[in-house]
């Protein structure tokens, strides 16, 4: 199901259904059953209460266990408006190396591969890439500790990942550490509910809490199709002659 459609479904559920009903276990149970393809949805419904006690290995194993869930069946969480934001900003950014953090099946790398003659295309995720995407180098790793050197990539993308992170502040610092010229972050504008699909832990109905973590870097952000699309130029780059 395309992101543009799921955003409409999310809007109806999160904005139009009364909160007391929307965040009740009995109301959300059938949606979890449909999303995860099983009646044994307790681990997924209780993910928020368990996540912060997880070790890195627990976290990896949880995501590896998602199997054929609705989030794994989607080609991408990105909407077209957010992809356009990235491609528009890339026209003003130099560099020939690109890393996609949380790359999944490599969808965004495929979309961006034709934007210029990249010298290096790479992706990193907590679980190995599935499917036939072999046009880029793949690394296993997870935020906030990625297996890359300081400023190793000219461009870094991190789309629909921040909402899943256990430590957002440390992860933002790590993304900036490995970025030389431009960092792109995309995440949903979504209000908090305990029972939410897609394993979300962090919610940004307003962008300001995240922007505070991006100081003193140069930031441009727009709301694109229900998602926050953010372009960050590291302070070291803006200060360069």
Feature roles, as predicted:
Residues 1-149, 159, 172, 196-241:
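Conserved N-terminal segment of class I S-adenosyl-L-methionine
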Residues 96, 154, 181:
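Conserved acidic residues
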Residues 118-119, 179-181:
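A short helix->loop->beta-strand "cap" motif at the edges of active sites that frequently abuts
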Residues 157-166:
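A short SAM/SAH-binding and catalytic strip from SAM-dependent methyltransferases
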Residues 165-174:
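A short, conserved alpha-helix within the catalytic core of class I
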Residues 166, 179-180, 215:
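Short conserved AdoMet
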Residues 181-189:
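Conserved beta-strand signature within the Rossmann-like core of class I S-adenosyl-L-methionine
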Residues 192-194:
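Short, solvent-exposed loop/turn segments at secondary-structure junctions
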